[in-house]
């Protein structure tokens, strides 16, 4: 089985390209919060989706799409890549797929397709997970070092000027005795 190789497309020749829906992987990532860019509920989302998975799911829904690998996600600078999906019929506001009326339903359908394509989601690489043995050694119970005992003595001195404009009272001087 040979996989189709992506080809370069001149988007200036595609009519209405600017009106295509833009989908980032964060929009359907169930591991993220709404503040980080998730647009569907956690139940409908997918754990760490990739651009090729989203493109394959979109193609199965009968919607043409283009992967733009050079584009970045505005909320995360280092997340590169997005999809542009031709949602509407040419020159109209009618959706290509009558079962998908808007973008939210589109995102849910894409996530459902990805769950069917790859039900066992791989865990993302987390370099911090490799530090677990080191943390276990460093978090052993340490006996506290004996601290010197200090005694604080407060002495008072009478006020030097009786006609001061500040609040009255005795000045306190703290002295530490070891």
From Swiss-Prot:
GO BP, one annotated term: SRP-dependent cotranslational protein targeting to membrane, signal sequence recognition
Gene3D superfamilies: Signal recognition particle, SRP19-like subunit (3.30.56.30)
Location of the region described as Disordered in the Swiss-Prot/TrEMBL record: 135-178
Keyword Disulfide bond: no
GO CC annotation, single: signal recognition particle, endoplasmic reticulum targeting
Short name of one Pfam family: SRP19
GO molecular function annotations of the record: 7S RNA binding
Places the protein is found: Cytoplasm; Nucleus, Nucleolus
Domain of life: Eukaryota
Predominant subcellular localization, coarse grouping: cytoplasm
Sequence ranges of Low complexity compositional bias: 148-167
Spans traversing the lipid bilayer: none
Bias (Basic residues) ranges: 168-178
InterPro entries (alphabetical): Signal_recog_particle_SRP19, SRP19-like_sf
Keywords on record: Cytoplasm, Nucleus, Ribonucleoprotein, RNA-binding, Signal recognition particle
Role: Component of the signal recognition particle (SRP) complex, a ribonucleoprotein complex that mediates the cotranslational targeting of secretory and membrane proteins to the endoplasmic reticulum (ER). Binds directly to 7SL RNA. Mediates binding of srp54 to the SRP complex.
Assembly and interaction partners: Component of a signal recognition particle complex that consists of a 7SL RNA molecule and six protein subunits: srp72, srp68, srp54, srp19, srp14 and srp9.
Family, as annotated: Belongs to the SRP19 family.
Name the record gives this protein: Signal recognition particle 19 kDa protein homolog
Organism: Dictyostelium discoideum
């Amino acid at each position: 089985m040979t996989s189709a190789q992506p080809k370069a497309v001149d988007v200036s020749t595609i009519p209405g390209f600017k009106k295509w829906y833009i989908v980032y992987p964060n929009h359907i990532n169930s591991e993220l919060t709404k503040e980080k860019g998730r647009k569907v509920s956690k139940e409908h989302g997918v754990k760490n989706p990739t651009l090729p998975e989203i493109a394959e799911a979109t193609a199965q829904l009968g919607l043409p799409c283009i992967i733009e690998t050079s584009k970045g996600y505005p909320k995360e600078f280092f997340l590169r890549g997005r999809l542009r999906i031709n949602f509407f019929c040419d020159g109209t506001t009618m959706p290509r797929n009558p079962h998908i009326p808007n973008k939210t339903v589109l995102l849910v359908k894409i996530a459902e397709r990805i769950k069917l394509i790859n039900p066992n989601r791989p865990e993302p690489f987390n370099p911090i997970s490799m530090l677990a043995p080191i943390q276990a050694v460093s978090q052993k119970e340490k006996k506290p070092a004996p601290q010197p005992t200090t005694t604080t003595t407060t002495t008072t001195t009478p006020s030097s000027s009786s006609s001061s404009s500040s609040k009255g009272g005795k000045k306190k001087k703290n002295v530490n005795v070891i």
